[in-house]
């Protein structure tokens, strides 16, 4: 016979088992949510790859793609070994405001979903810079700044702003004032950081050859990318990724209200991007009479960047102002870069630094408890409206201080590194390599080798003729000299100079012969012309 005591014990055991299963279930659900969002954010690397590949000339496509590949590889190793420890490792009392110093190589740490989610954020911050230095950056420079950002710059910033011990997160508490750094999904810590470094890198590296030929001209010669479809596809992938970037920053899905916050963040993100795109498109059409696709994509991304800071607590109507501000700031910063004669092929500074800075400010202006709400309370004569106004402006001021700290830290660390690379001749490729393209010289792999294309019965015969025109050339100087066997391949730009719009082969005018870099290419062009006349 079961006694009351035994029955109570069994009930307690059953309750404990149910609690254990419930806790485990919630942990698994949250882990799955974080990993799922992180996978989508990781796919943003593909978006950056397409966006940047389409925006560069065909002769540099392989170069930009391998940089995007290695971004993921370098960042995971650096963040695993050092970055996580500096960002979220336990801190001693003396340095806890500025940096963590434990859990290197994830020693003693097992919250892998959280680590994976933060890693993809780190990779995003690092990959932003590659667009600003495209088509002229030495490979060692890319590896260097990618490593420094993922292992040092970004982790320290996240410790400042996203840990309870960080000085930005602690803020200032004095009387009625209680400020804390407000950046839900990284407008400042990810995008303002990456955008600021993009500005520095593009400035120190200098413009691409031919970008600003006339020092007296405030405009620039447009250097066209080779694939609008690639750029558009990359933009769509990034738009998709931003929904997970911001929605996933809730970091859980099992608590009451989590699903609502995730949905709100995603809705605000796409709304901000939409308003930014439309305001920019309208202004651009008014100024130039053209409905631009490429720049509208950038404006949309700028709006999504701006939404990162306050998307979890803004009302959807507020996205009108977030998006409009982001679109106009992108327009202003893009024109400023041209006026300063700083060549940023992907507008990385305008998109990420401009959008990121506005995001930090707007989260303290039009989010709940922001300046706009405090002013409305003051006008309506609400109780304690004066205190609310003081708190709102104090929070806005703290956001400004934190934004300047992010810029100062990012530039302060990278400036001496870029300076050393420039002084040692490792910052930028030679003029010869830049003019002829990085793909062949640096990687030995053309993105679009003409020998890979075939559409007729005479391809084999023509391939044999082309092979006969192969030549050896010497590239580089001193210890960097290389003797390379060059087949008469041409970039897409050079091929376009041979064909007219109807697809017929036309004679080469004298002034365009400079497009061909060796005698083999000239021979091939002449051969194609001679065959066409038969």
From Swiss-Prot:
One of its GO terms (cellular component) is plasma membrane. It is found in: Membrane. Keywords: Ammonia transport, Membrane, Transmembrane, Transmembrane helix, Transport. It is a multi-pass membrane protein. Its main location: membrane. The keyword Transport applies. Gene3D superfamilies: Ammonium transporter AmtB like domains. The chain crosses the membrane at residues 31-51, 69-89, 115-135, 139-159, 184-204, 223-243, 263-283, 291-311, 318-338, 346-366, 401-421. GO terms for molecular function: ammonium channel activity. GO terms for biological process: ammonium homeostasis; ammonium transmembrane transport. The keyword Isomerase does not apply. NCBIfam families: amt. Belongs to the ammonia transporter channel (TC 1.A.11.2) family. Involved in the uptake of ammonia. This is Putative ammonium transporter 1. It comes from Caenorhabditis elegans.
């Amino acid at each position: 016979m079961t006694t009351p005591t035994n029955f109570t014990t069994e009930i307690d055991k059953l309750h404990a088992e149910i609690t254990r299963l419930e806790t485990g279930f919630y942990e698994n659900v949250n882990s799955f949510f974080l990993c799922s969002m992180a996978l989508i954010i990781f796919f943003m690397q593909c978006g950056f790859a397409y966006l940047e590949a389409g925006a560069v000339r065909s002769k540099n496509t392989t170069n930009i793609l391998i940089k995007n590949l290695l971004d993921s590889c370098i960042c995971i190793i650096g963040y695993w070994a050092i970055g996580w420890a500096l960002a979220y490792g336990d801190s001693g009392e003396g340095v806890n405001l500025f940096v963590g110093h434990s859990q290197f190589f994830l020693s003693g740490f097992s919250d892998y979903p959280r680590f994976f989610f933060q890693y993809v954020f780190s990779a995003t911050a690092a990959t932003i810079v590659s667009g600003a230095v495209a088509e002229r950056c030495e490979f060692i420079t890319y590896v260097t700044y990618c490593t420094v950002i993922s292992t040092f710059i970004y982790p320290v910033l996240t410790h400042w702003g996203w840990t309870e011990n960080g000085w930005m997160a602690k803020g200032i508490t004095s009387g009625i004032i209680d400020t804390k750094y407000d950046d839900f999904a990284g407008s400042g810590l990810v995008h303002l950081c990456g955008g600021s470094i993009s500005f520095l890198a593009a400035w120190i590296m200098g413009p691409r050859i031919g970008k600003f030929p006339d020092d007296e001209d405030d405009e620039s010669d447009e250097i066209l990318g080779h694939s609008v479809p690639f750029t558009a596809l990359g933009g769509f992938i990034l738009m998709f990724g931003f929904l997970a970037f911001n929605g996933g920053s809730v970091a859980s899905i099992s608590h009451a209200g989590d699903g609502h916050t995730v949905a709100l963040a995603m809705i605000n993100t796409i709304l901000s991007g939409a308003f930014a795109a439309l305001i920019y498109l309208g202004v651009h059409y008014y100024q130039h009479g053209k409905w631009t696709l490429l720049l509208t994509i950038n404006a949309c991304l700028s709006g999504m960047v701006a939404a990162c800071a306050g998307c979890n607590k803004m009302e959807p109507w507020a996205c009108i102002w977030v998006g409009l501000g982001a679109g106009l700031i992108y327009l202003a910063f893009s024109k400023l870069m041209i006026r300063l004669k700083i060549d940023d092929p992907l507008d990385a500074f305008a998109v990420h630094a401009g959008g990121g800075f506005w995001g930090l400010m707007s989260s303290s202006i039009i989010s709940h408890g922001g300046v706009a709400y405090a002013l409305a309370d003051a006008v309506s004569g609400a109780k304690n409206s004066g205190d609310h106004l003081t708190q709102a402006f104090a929070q806005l001021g703290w956001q400004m201080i934190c934004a300047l700290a992010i810029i100062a830290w990012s530039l302060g660390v990278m400036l001496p590194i870029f300076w050393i690379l420039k002084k040692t001749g490792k910052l930028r490729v030679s003029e010869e390599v830049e003019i002829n393209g990085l793909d062949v010289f640096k990687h030995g792999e053309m993105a679009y080798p003409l020998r890979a294309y075939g559409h007729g019965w005479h391809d084999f015969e023509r391939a044999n003729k082309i092979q006969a025109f192969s030549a050896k050339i010497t590239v580089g100087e001193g210890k960097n000299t290389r003797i390379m066997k060059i087949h008469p391949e041409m970039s897409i730009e050079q091929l376009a100079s041979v064909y007219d719009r109807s697809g017929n082969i036309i004679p080469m005018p004298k002034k365009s012969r400079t497009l061909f870099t060796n005698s083999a290419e000239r021979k091939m062009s002449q051969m194609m012309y001679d065959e066409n006349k038969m």
